[in-house]
Regions:
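Glycine-centered coil/turn sites that cap beta-strands in beta-rich domains
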Residues: 3-28, 34-38
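Intrinsic-disorder/low-complexity, polar/charged segments enriched in Ser/Thr/Lys/Arg/Asp/Glu/Gln
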Residues: 7-9, 19, 49-51, 68, ...
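Residue-level detector of beta-strand face positions
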Residues: 23, 53-55, 70-72
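Surface-exposed loop/turn motifs at beta-strand-loop junctions within extracellular Ig-like
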Residues: 26, 58, 75-77
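Short proline/glycine- and polar residue-rich coil/turn motifs
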Residues: 39-48
Length: 88
């Protein structure tokens, strides 16, 4: 999902069913957005219909500033963190 403007999809795979949550943080470690997907079956979540969608906005609906962000995907005990860039 790099770079993107103003929205992105974050693809992921689950090896087993789990509760899935994605949090987006700015580079100061502040949580910008949380997306709770709930309990999902094992499988590939790669297309626009399945991947995590982030509209580039914070929790109150304001557009996030240009810059580097980190998303954290949690699925059961699994945690993945990756950087992404909003370029406006």
């Amino acid at each position: 999902p790099n770079p993107f403007n103003p929205e992105t999809w974050i693809p992921f795979d689950l090896s087993e069913a789990a509760d899935v949550t994605v949090r987006v943080y700015d580079m100061q470690g502040r949580e910008v957005r949380r997306v709770a997907l709930g309990y999902l079956d094992a499988g590939a979540y790669r297309g626009r219909a399945d991947a995590v969608y982030w509209d580039g906005r914070n929790e109150v609906g304001e557009p996030a500033a240009s810059g580097v962000y980190v998303y954290e995907l949690r699925a059961g005990e699994f945690v993945e963190r990756r950087r992404m860039v909003i370029r406006k």
